């Protein structure tokens, strides 16, 4: 019987795949002129995979790695969007210098043997 954190457990493999996908997306963004402000930022209300800035825009980016881009796109659920939005609010409290930027929620999709796909303005806050 394997321990939950063993190298062969599905959870560990998924975590490694996620770390790789986020790294790939950071490079993809940098090559397109984005400056990475933070990555893997956590607070009690949630986690933000990547925060990136270009010009007057601060993108809050959720990275999804799946076997194909379609299933990756479908995996950002409303509950997760709300958690990410709460985390973004908490982040901005720690970085008031970024509060004047236009806040945008993006998704980056990663699938094997394909470049990352960036979906800008993937959702908006309700209200």
Language-model segment annotations:
Residues 6, 31-58:
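Active-site metal-binding core of divalent-cation-utilizing nuclease and nuclease-like domains
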Residues 37, 72, 115, 119:
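Glycine-rich, flexible loop/turn motifs
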Residues 1-39:
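Acidic-basic catalytic patches of nuclease active cores, encompassing PD-(D/E)XK
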């Amino acid at each position: 019987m394997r321990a939950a954190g063993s190298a062969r457990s599905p959870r560990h493999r998924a975590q490694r795949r996620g770390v790789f996908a986020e790294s790939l997306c950071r490079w993809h963004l940098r090559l397109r002129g984005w400056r990475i402000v933070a990555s893997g930022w956590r607070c009690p209300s949630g986690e933000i995979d990547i925060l990136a800035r270009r010009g007057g825009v601060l993108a809050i980016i959720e990275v999804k790695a799946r076997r194909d881009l379609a299933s990756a796109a479908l995996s950002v659920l409303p509950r997760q969007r709300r958690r990410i939005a709460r985390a973004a609010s908490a982040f901005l409290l720690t970085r008031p210098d970024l509060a004047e930027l236009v806040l945008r929620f993006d998704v980056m999709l990663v699938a094997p043997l394909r470049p990352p796909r960036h979906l800008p303005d993937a959702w908006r806050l309700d209200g």
